[in-house]
Every structure is written in structure tokens, then in C-alpha cells.
């Protein structure tokens, strides 16, 4: 049982013991280091802040440079917080977090930000049917239709489905199975797809059930 921060490399197909092709996602989960230990008496809650990767110091702002130096680790690309219960182990400031805390066949939850689709209409965003394509109709094929009554209630209700920005939502995919772990290269291979585009960062947390 554990938790770690990873970078989505992409998808591929691998073969299992039954020689069946399985779609998998490859995640670069490391090197990860503890950059801050938050305590309830000081920050108000218990959590580990974890950073991933190493980047040039000049690419990081001065406040973050001091933050990383305090932890005694090199500047990273991304920071994320995990609850004490999620990591299920005692960690000190600057200590490494490895993929070896997971096991092959273990179920995990993957948290990430979905792909952004930009401004989308109601047919793409909410799966509306659109208007009829005959009987004199000329320009209403992809229109949303009525959004409310005129005299009563004389307003548009909150939450009415309309066109707008689609995607870039926080998504949690639960109970994915770890297909393979490669500790020497800090890689985790997970069955199925995970949220987000290539090179996006995801949190991998063992399921509580």
C-alpha cells in the first residue's frame, strides 16, 4: 500500500500470461522526494508534500529554490500532497519515495486532470440530439433549443446545460490494476487508461478497499 506522483508517458500493449494483448499506460513515477512534512499543530493537517524529477535551479523561482534547499533535494518539476494514511509509512524530510511500495496486481486509484477540449457546443459537451433537419428548419441543427420559459419562471435556472469549456476536469479513475513495476527505471505500468494527455502528472494511490 502506498502513494506516489508520476508522469504519464503514453500507452502501449503488453501480453499477459495467457498471451492476451492488454492495453496499458506507462507512468514515470520518480525519482520522488519528500519536500515538506505538514503537521496538524502547525499547518492544520497532516500531509507529505512530494516533488518529482530534477530540473535546473535557474528554472525555479527564488522562493521555491529555498523551499527545496530546506528539504535538501534538487528542484523538481511538480509538487503534490498526500495524506499520511495514503502513504502508510513514516517518511522524513528529503527521503525518497519509490515505486517499490506497490506490488504487481495491486489495485490503485489514479487522479489527474482530463484533456482540455476547449469551447464546445451542447451536442459535443452534453450529448444533445440537436434540432430536426427538415420541415423548414435551416440553421438549428446543433442549437441547444429553449433554456427556460418566458413569463414563468422568467429566468434561466442554475445548472442549465449549455455550451462552454469542456475538459480540464479533476478526474479519479478507481480500481485500476498494476500490470508491471520496473524499479530500476521508476516505471509503473497500469492496465487501462488514466486521465490526461501525455506528459501530464497524475497521483497514484492504493485503494482503501
UniProtKB/Swiss-Prot annotation:
Protein known as: Large ribosomal subunit protein uL3
Disordered: annotated span: 124-156
Record note on quaternary structure: Part of the 50S ribosomal subunit. Forms a cluster with proteins L14 and L19.
Its biological purpose: One of the primary rRNA binding proteins, it binds directly near the 3'-end of the 23S rRNA, where it nucleates assembly of the 50S subunit.
Gene Ontology MF annotations: rRNA binding; structural constituent of ribosome
Encoding gene, per UniProt annotation: rplC
SUPFAM superfamilies in the cross-refs: Translation proteins (SSF50447)
The keyword rRNA-binding is assigned to this record: yes
GO BP: any one term: translation
Family of the protein in this entry: Belongs to the universal ribosomal protein uL3 family.
GO cellular component assignments: cytosolic large ribosomal subunit
One family name in Pfam for this protein: Ribosomal_L3
Record has RNA-binding as a keyword: yes
UniProt keyword list: Ribonucleoprotein, Ribosomal protein, RNA-binding, rRNA-binding
Gene3D superfamilies: 3.30.160.810, Translation factors
UniProt cross-references to InterPro entries, sorted A to Z: Ribosomal_uL3, Ribosomal_uL3_bac/org-type, Ribosomal_uL3_CS, Transl_B-barrel_sf
Amino acid at each position: 500500500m502506498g502513494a506516489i506522483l508520476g508522469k504519464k508517458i503514453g500507452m502501449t500493449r503488453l501480453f499477459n500470461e495467457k498471451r492476451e494483448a492488454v492495453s496499458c499506460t506507462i507512468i514515470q513515477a520518480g525519482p520522488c522526494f519528500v519536500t515538506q512534512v505538514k503537521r496538524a499543530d502547525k499547518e492544520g493537517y497532516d500531509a507529505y508534500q512530494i516533488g518529482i524529477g530534477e530540473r535546473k535551479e535557474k528554472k525555479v523561482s527564488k522562493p521555491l529554490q529555498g523551499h527545496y534547499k530546506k528539504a535538501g533535494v534538487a528542484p523538481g518539476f511538480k509538487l503534490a500532497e498526500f495524506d499520511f494514511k495514503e502513504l502508510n509509512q513514516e517518511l522524513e524530510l528529503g527521503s525518497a519515495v519509490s515505486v517499490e511500495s506497490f506490488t504487481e496486481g495491486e489495485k490503485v486509484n489514479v487522479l489527474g486532470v482530463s484533456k482540455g477540449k476547449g469551447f464546445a457546443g451542447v451536442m459535443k459537451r452534453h450529448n444533445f440530439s440537436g434540432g430536426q433537419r427538415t420541415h423548414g428548419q435551416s440553421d438549428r441543427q446543433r442549437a441547444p433549443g429553449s433554456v427556460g420559459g418566458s413569463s414563468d419562471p422568467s429566468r434561466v435556472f442554475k445548472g442549465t446545460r449549455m455550451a462552454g469549456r469542456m475538459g480540464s476536469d479533476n478526474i479519479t479513475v478507481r480500481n485500476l490494476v498494476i500490470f508491471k513495476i520496473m524499479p530500476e527505471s521508476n516505471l509503473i505500468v497500469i492496465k487501462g487508461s488514466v486521465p490526461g494527455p501525455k506528459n501530464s502528472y497524475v497521483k497514484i494511490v492504493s485503494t482503501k478497499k
